[in-house]
Amino acid sequence: MTLRGVSMVLTWCLLVSKAWSSGDDSSIDIRGPRLVMPSQARDSCSTQQTTELCVEGNWGRKCPGGCRMLSMLSRTEKDSMRRVDELTKRLARMIQLHTEIHSYYRSVSDVSNQVVTDREDTEARFYALLSDLERKIIYLQRRINGQLTLLSQLRNGIAQQTSTILQLEVDTDVALRTCKGACARQVRYRVDKEMNLQLEKANAYLSGINLALFEEIVHESFSVERDDARSLHPYSGGPASDSEPRDGDGTASQATGFRSDATDPGVSHGNSSKSFGNVDERSKVEKDVNVASTSSVSSSSSSSSSSSSTSSTISSTQKTEELSFKKVSVSTAAVAGKDTDDFQWDSVQTASQTEEGFVRDTGADSTWNQHNVQWNSDFGTASDDEPDFQARSHRTNLSEYIDCLDVLQRRPGGKASGLYEVRPRGAKRALTVHCEQDTDGGGWTLVQQREDGSLNFNRSFSAYREGFGTVDGSGHGELWLGLEAMYLLAHEDSTMRVELQGWDGAGAHAEYTVTLRDDSKGYALQVSDYRGTAGNALVSGVADDPELTSHGGMTFSTYDRDTDKWSDGSCAEWYGGGWWINACQAANLNGVYYQGGPYDPREKPPYEVENGVVWATYRGSDYSLKRTAVRFRRVQIPIVE
């Protein structure tokens, strides 16, 4: 190459280097000119072309131009917006799904709550049926034991008579044989050996029949099973000291009807029990069976007194024997005293009264024998009454027992008279009542009592519906339990026992089978089947006018709610107390309390009528009684003979 050629090359490189460093628009771009399609609008990017969008040190020589950068930003923005829209739609779907799930959860929760409620109701019905079944089983066992005792006595009697017949035949044959040749008249006697053989076979067959008594399933054993099942149905209440009756406690706890609070009161039992005199205390089972067993199953009976011996002794005064039930076996008890329903109002004596058939031992773990009916007074320990606080249940505020009969048959220690908390079927709240467990088999719920006139019984219908008055643990006080509570206790067939006492100390009683209707039916009293010594005042009424004085089927009437049959006025207003009144009355135990007994109606303004505490068939309408008591007890399951 010549010198001239080298010079031209150097000049060209110098120019190119200068153009590169100047950055002028007129200089040549290293990337060269861009191709522009005919459809593109170049003017829209003209401003960006003059703008330095990047630095050489950062991007290098391939830095994109303004139009390309704008396109990339636009594409990125669209992609971001698309993602935002997609996320927004997903969020909306999630919100909708959450709403649906919440609604489904609410519906499932409602169904679950309903299932739990239905299960609680089913549990309540189940345990009520279980309780009824338990009582029926115990009752059937006692009746069966009574019948087995009868059969055993009949078998023994047949065996004894068979032996006597055989002995008489032998004696007769011997006597006739020894008379031959010495008697004025010859008698031929032939012993029927074939018949005797048949009698012996029949007697042997009867002796082979097993007539052993059933071991009675007492309620304590059932209570243990219920304790194990408390995870489904525990009884309500707190500690045993607050929720269960305490035997022998002398506190002034009182029965006032329905309780408004949720706490369970301490329950007291007095040391003495009110008695309406020498009442026949035999239970219905004892009166029906009316026999005594020939042997005792329990080992304790073998060492008992002559009243519980294995030999059967018929009382000369009563000509019958009573069946006395103990925990396991049936033992003999002979009545040695006067059996009468005309009784005196006396306190329970601690001394032995064998002439009246009443014996009481005052020991700590004694056995009461009243009219030769033995009751075990072992009330258990405080731990027996402890509830299972770890049990699972939604029903923590319900009482375990429905009435006094339920307390007697199921509650350990429930054989003592006193205050107990019960909850009849259908009741919304617990009810504190006085239970009489010593009269005619026990299980009686006190609903009315007059004894000193300290309480005014001329009250409004609402007061009679809710109840008023109190009694203590010993059963002293004046009380009207309340029509609503009485309806819950006697809306099914029940026995109503009316106990009366005059000012001379003599007493009488009347028992009826009753059913009480609800408020919509005016608490009408359906009454039938009278038995007792006080006279049938409720059904028969006054002899001169039975149709207008009978109380059967009558609604409850007060001075402010006149539902009686008298068209000329209000019987309740005239006679001074609410009652089941016709037009007007043969009995009213809620009348005006007059001291002394007999009274002159003409001296009792303003109406001058027989408005005392009366039972016309007992002492007449002009005699105001000193003490009265009305008690209810459910009718137990009848046994078809």
Curated annotation (Swiss-Prot):
User: Where would one find the signal peptide in this protein?
Assistant: 1-23
* Entry comment, domain topic: A long coiled coil structure formed by 3 polypeptide chains connects the central nodule to the C-terminal domains (distal nodules). The long C-terminal ends of the alpha chains fold back, contributing a fourth strand to the coiled coil structure.
The name this protein carries in UniProt is Fibrinogen alpha-2 chain
Task: Show the SMART domains listed in the entry.
Answer: FBG (SM00186), Fib_alpha (SM01212)
Give start-end positions of Basic and acidic residues composition bias: 279-289
Say where the protein is mainly found.
secreted
- Could you give a GO molecular-function term held by this entry? extracellular matrix structural constituent
Which keywords does UniProt give here?
Answer: Blood coagulation, Coiled coil, Disulfide bond, Glycoprotein, Hemostasis, Repeat, Secreted, Signal
Q: Where is this region: Disordered?
A: 228-327
Q: What does this protein do?
A: Fibrinogen has a double function: yielding monomers that polymerize into fibrin and acting as a cofactor in platelet aggregation.
* Pfam families in UniProt: Fib_alpha, Fibrinogen_C
Q: List, alphabetically, the InterPro entries matched.
A: FIB_ANG-like, Fibrinogen-like_C, Fibrinogen_a/b/g_C_1, Fibrinogen_a/b/g_C_dom, Fibrinogen_a/b/g_coil_dom, Fibrinogen_CS
Q: PANTHER family, from UniProt?
A: FIBRINOGEN ALPHA CHAIN, FIBRINOGEN C-TERMINAL DOMAIN-CONTAINING PROTEIN
Site annotated as Cleavage: where? Answer: R31, G32
Q: Where in the cell is it found?
A: Secreted
Q: Which residue ranges have biased composition labelled Low complexity?
A: 293-317
- Which species is listed as the source? Petromyzon marinus
